[in-house]
């Protein structure tokens, strides 16, 4: 996978799928810190060892995490990055942005198992936030998008 390969050529997202990703992301970002905090709380619940990768949040309960300044700061950073990735879906820069993310995650020993869990809980959190708006089309668009991104991250991780 070349560094200049575009998101479209990597995954063949349709214009309708891209529109669904962008519109649902806009909905999710109306509660950005709460939504992203929920994703990480779900990760920590499913894999308590993951919480130790965040020393400033280690040992905090879910209730404490929801009000933690560190969690809010992390949620803002993650939501800003994800917004950038979504904004850059159609550009040649996305693989480079993901390569930077991979380098950061490599330093923290984040790998396929962690990406798999993130994808699982991301879908759970999107479904919980969107409720009846979480249609099969929304599910499929997010699943396809995450599979594409995960593929790039794992490929960059291995190289």
Swiss-Prot record:
Pfam family, one: Globin
Cross-referenced InterPro entries: Globin (IPR000971), Globin-like_sf (IPR009050), Globin/Proto (IPR012292), Mb-like_M (IPR044399)
Source species, domain of life: Eukaryota
Signal peptide start and end residues: none
SS bond partners: none
Keyword Iron (UniProt): yes
Alphabetical keyword list: Acetylation, Heme, Iron, Metal-binding, Oxygen transport, Transport
Subunit structure: Homodimer.
Additional facts recorded: Caudina arenicola coelomocytes contain four hemoglobin chains labeled A, B, C, D.
Protein name from the UniProt record: Globin D, coelomic
Organism this protein belongs to: Molpadia arenicola
